[in-house]
Swiss-Prot record:
Disulfide bonds: none
Protein's recorded name: Protein PsbN
Protein source organism: Coleochaete orbicularis
One Gene Ontology CC term in the entry: chloroplast thylakoid membrane
PANTHER family recorded: PROTEIN PSBN
Localization per Swiss-Prot or TrEMBL: Plastid, Chloroplast thylakoid membrane
Amino acid sequence: METGILIVIFISCLLVSFTGYAVYTAFGQPSKKLRDPFEEHED
């Protein structure tokens, strides 16, 4: 394989992994630990 193809595959895997981790953090089990600053603010 060409070096360019391997680099593109590597960067694509990194991007997909980061996106999956971000979705898991936002909506998965760790999301219960996140605080909502809008709910903490009282008018």
